Each structure stands twice: as C-alpha cells, then as structure tokens.
C-alpha cells in the first residue's frame, strides 16, 4: 500500500528525534545497475552540531538486506549534504561488509552518486516551485550547501544554480514583492466584500460563478507551480541566473563586493559608480562566499569580478558623461598623488586617480594579484603569518576635500594639517569598512581636525 505523508513524518521523527515536520523527503527505489532503497529527509531547521561539530558527519544509516550495518555512514553522501537525514537499504552488499572497505566500494560509490543527484534535484524542485519553503531551507542550510561548489566538481553546476545572494537590487525586489502582495490582498478583500453584497436571489448564479472561479484559480495555481520561480522574492535574494537575466546586454562579467555584512557593503564608496550606471552587484557577506565564487570562477560563461579590483573595467556603453573628463588643475592632482605616495608609504601600496568615484573623496582597492580584505581575514584565521595586502588608495580629484588638499599642498608642503588629512583619507575608508587601526591615534586626529574646522568657521564668520 502507498505510504502516507503522516507515516513519512512519523518515520522522520523516529529516525532523527526532530519533532518538527521536515521540509521535504525523497523515497528512492533503484533496481539497476544495483538494487537499493532509500528514504531521505531535508529537515526544517539546522541542528547546532551541523556547523560546529569537531568532525562533520553524514546522518545516513546503512542497512544490508534490512540488517543494520552502520549509522552516520559518511560514504553515502558528500559532506556538503550532511544536513540530510535518512536510511539506505542495499541488497547488493554482503552482510559481513567491513566498515573500512566501504570507502572504496563501487556499490557504495554508485549509491552515493545516485542519492546526491536525487537530493539536488529535490532541492532544485523546491527552489523552482516553492520559493517560500526554499527560503527557509536556504536560511538553515545555505552556508553548508555552498561547500558543494568547491568540493563536488561533478555537481558544481547544479549546486551553483541553487546559490542565493543579496544584491544591490535586493531592496527593490523586496519592495516589489511587498507591493504585489499588498495588491493581491486588497483584491482578495474587495472580492470578498463584493461577494458578501450579492443578493440572496442571485445565490445560485454566484455559486456557479464561484465554482468556475475556483476551477480557474486551481488551474492558475497548477500553472504557477509548474513554472519555475527563479527569485526568492520574499527577502530580495537572487540566484545567479536572476543576475544573468537582468544584466546589461554588453555586460560580460558578474560584479560582486565582499564584506562583513550587508550594511557595510552597501555603504562602500565603490558602489557609487554601479548605482549611477544601474549595474547590479552581488553582496558576498558570508565568510565562505568569496571562496565559493573563486572556486566557481564563472557562471554561464561570465567571470566573477570584484568591484574593489584596481584594474576594474566597466562596460563602455554605460560610462557616465563627465566622469572621465580631465580636471581643471591636473598639475595640482599630480602633485598631491606624489605627496601621498611618500606620506602614506607605510599604509598603502600605491596612490592614483580614480575614474569610478563620484561622491566620495577616496577608496581603497585591491592591487592585481592581491586578495580582498574578507579573504585575507579568512586566511589569517588559519595562518597568522599570512601577509597583509597593501591596498591602492584611489582619489576622486573632483571632490572638494581632495581639491582643497591640493591647494594646501601648493601653499605649504610641510603643513601639519595636510599630514593629518592625508592619514585621515585612509582612516576614513577603514571607518566605513568597520575597521579602525590605532583607535587612540584616530581619536586624537579627529579632535585636531574638529578644532581646525571650528577655527576656520569662526574666521569665515568674522571676515
């Protein structure tokens, strides 16, 4: 007889000890080329040990001809699917199979390959047809699933299609989704009010109409379920395919920015040029995100490019008018760049003009061959001797602060105020990134600059 949903859920609770309903399950029966049966579940919530266990393990129990052989059999699934719970029963293994021999057993390898493919298909089905449920899955297990991009070359493309990120378009997507939901709710309320106002004399007609509407709604629901929903609109999360579909016609790369949190990357000065040009940027805020895109390298033949790369090139057709125009006083900027290279030699690797900044005075970018701050932090967690990258300081020559520094330099190259401003350019960017080197020095510097600014304001008022 057919197994009911209640029976599947009861078995899951017995197997896992989890009293919540699972998000999904897959019942597999395979006869060729080997014979095995499996029931696997995707839980609703992540257990604590999933990320913090000293030795990660796969929670799949192995049976042979219905005889228990081993629990937590790591050979049955790749570790990035360790959130899956389940049981496998195989008829093509001997009852006396040794645990030590499972790793290189061709039967086990085939089971692993088949199960992995079916689980990924189940997750993909959820992402296409049940975006709300997929959001729950992603919040619980997304950080673990990402490991598959680097660790499972065979299924890398499949896993990459399941990745989700926030992006510079996320806020708009979330607003659009909320607006659609509000419109839908309002329409439903209006429809209910209209139905309530219909006279009893027309009840039969209303009932017939309601039946027809219900049938149409059911057809529409079926159609909606069969049509893949590529974006988890609820929280503005986007897939890589979403990004590709929205990209400019001549855009050949996927832009991303990495940082500790969404607020930090949104406030990055480097985002200015992309907002002006209406170019979408992925936000990589999980510690493993940059490792993931470096492993993936490309999606749909488009390379991943960090927006803090020094040699970044933007599409020609969307360059802003006036951004690359020569400034009025080239000599002033050249002199300032030369001065800053000397004054900040211990803090930055290079100083140059920027052709991407529009509102901010400066930004720090990663030189060719260097690693981002997020990746550097990750590397230094495992190796404290990992060398720190000296980033390049880019100046916006049209910003008043930079122009004024150039004028101060022309008047007095040895000005103490100019030296303070020079170092504050670097500190300004670090503050925006949530990192402060030598807080006491920065506090003293800010106090001096406050005094200078107030004195200048008084002089201007009395003049």
Regions found by a protein language model. Give the residues of each.
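Conserved GHKL (Bergerat-fold) ATPase module
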Residues: 1-463
């Amino acid at each position: 007889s057919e197994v009911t949903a209640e029976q599947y859920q009861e078995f899951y609770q017995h197997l896992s000890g989890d009293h919540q309903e699972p998000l999904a399950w897959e019942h597999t029966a395979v006869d060729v080329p080997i014979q095995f049966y499996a029931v696997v579940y995707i839980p609703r919530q992540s257990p604590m040990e999933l990320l913090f266990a000293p030795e990660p393990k796969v929670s799949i129990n192995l049976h042979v001809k219905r005889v228990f052989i081993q629990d937590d059999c790591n050979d049955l699934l790749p570790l990035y699917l360790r959130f899956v719970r389940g049981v496998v029963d195989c008829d093509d293994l001997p009852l006396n199979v040794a645990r030590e021999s499972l790793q290189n057993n061709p039967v086990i390898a085939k089971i692993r390959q088949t199960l992995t493919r079916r689980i990924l298909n189940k997750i993909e089905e959820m992402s296409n047809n049940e975006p709300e449920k997929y959001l729950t899955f992603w919040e619980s297990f997304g950080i673990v699933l990402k490991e598959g991009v680097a660790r499972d070359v065979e299924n890398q493309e499949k896993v990459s299609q399941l990745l989700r990120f926030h992006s510079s378009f996320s806020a708009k997507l979330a607003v659009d989704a909320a607006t659609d939901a509000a419109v839908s709710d309002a329409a439903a309320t209006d429809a209910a009010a209209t139905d309530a106002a219909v006279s009893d004399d027309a009840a039969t007609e209303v009932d017939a109409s309601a039946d027809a509407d219900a049938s149409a709604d059911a057809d529409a629901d079926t159609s909606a379920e069969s049509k893949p929903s590529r974006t988890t609109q609820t929280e503005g999360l986007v897939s890589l395919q979403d990004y590709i579909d929205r990209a400019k016609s001549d855009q050949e790369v996927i832009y991303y920015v990495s940082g500790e949190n969404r607020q930090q990357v949104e406030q990055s000065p480097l985002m200015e040029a992309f907002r002006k040009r209406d170019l979408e940027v992925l936000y990589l805020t999980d510690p493993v995100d940059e490792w993931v895109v470096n492993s993936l390298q490309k999606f749909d033949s488009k390379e991943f490019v960090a927006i803090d790369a020094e040699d970044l090139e933007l599409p020609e057709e969307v360059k802003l008018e006036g951004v690359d125009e020569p400034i009025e006083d080239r000599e002033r900027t050249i002199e300032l760049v030369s001065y800053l290279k000397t004054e900040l030699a211990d803090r930055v690797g290079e100083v140059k003009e920027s052709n991407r900044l529009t509102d901010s005075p400066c930004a720090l970018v990663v030189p060719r061959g260097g690693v981002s701050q997020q990746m550097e932090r990750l590397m230094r967690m495992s190796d404290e001797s990992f060398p720190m990258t000296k980033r390049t300081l880019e100046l916006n020559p049209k910003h008043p602060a930079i122009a004024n520094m150039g004028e101060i330099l022309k008047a007095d190259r040895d000005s103490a105020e100019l030296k303070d401003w020079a170092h504050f350019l670097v500190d300004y960017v670090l503050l925006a990134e949530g990192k402060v080197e030598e807080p006491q020095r920065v506090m003293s510097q800010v106090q001096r600059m406050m005094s200078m600014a107030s004195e200048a304001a008084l002089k201007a008022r009395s003049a």
